[in-house]
Amino acid sequence: MRIEGAIFDLDGTLTDSMYIWNEAPKALVRKFGGEPPEDLARDIREMGRREASEYMVDTFCLPCTPQQVMEGVNALVTGEYRDRVPMKTGADTLLERLGALGVPCGIATASEAFQARDAMVRLGLWKHFLFAFSSLQYGPKTGPDLYRAAARSLGSAPERTVVFEDALHAARSAKRAGFLVAGVYAPSAEEDQEALRCLCDWYLPRLDSPDFLAALERG
């Protein structure tokens, strides 16, 4: 089957940036006087930004608003995207191959759209994308709306659009919405890898996995 569109997650898929989301929420809770558990990131990983901020304010009785938490986290992470987050191995090779095949690509991220652009511009990858959409505008990845909006902008039907995701809950949402899904290995979610492998149409230990590149060529 010929792929007519590709939608990429950002954190853990295009970039090795999950460390940001392991540390930034804990730093904000401490800033406002709370004592977060070491695994706070795991507790909030399936939540959207707003829901996670509300959870932190309520759970740790923080003397601030959810909006202040969101703004504080943004202040911590924006510089990381702009200046430091590294590219996942093979991202450039895969994107070049998709471009050579005429497959349009977009980003669908739980981060801010401008953060995705900042990272992609610095890494020299932004030229491969038509847009970056954020779940802050289109809804969390527990639902299909973000992926559907991205597919509409690509001009591709879900059944001919592949979604690249490292997060199991996001891959499930895309699969339920009728998309093809490529699960991307992420060491931060080691315990989810077998389920991701079973769920997805393809499982990629790295983005430039030879078997997947060959499948793209075959169409």
Q: Where do the protein language model's features map onto the residues?
A:
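Asp-based, Mg2+/Mn2+-dependent phosphohydrolase catalytic module
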Residues: M1-E4, E96-G99, A113, R117-G219
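N-terminal helical cap/lid subdomain that shapes the substrate entry/recognition surface
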Residues: R2-T93, R97-L101, F114, W126
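Conserved phosphate-coupling serine/threonine residues in phosphotransfer and NTP-handling enzymes
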Residues: T13, T109-S111, Y185
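Conserved SAM-binding loop
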Residues: L14, C105, V163-F164
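Short linear Ser/Thr-Pro motifs
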Residues: S17, T109-S111, A167
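Residue-level detector of anion-binding/catalytic polar loops
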Residues: E35, P104, L180
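A structural signal for short, well-ordered beta-strand elements
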Residues: R45-E46, L62, R84, T109, ...
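Short, flexible loop segments at the rims of nucleotide/cofactor-binding pockets, characterized by
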Residues: R82-P86, A110, V181-G183
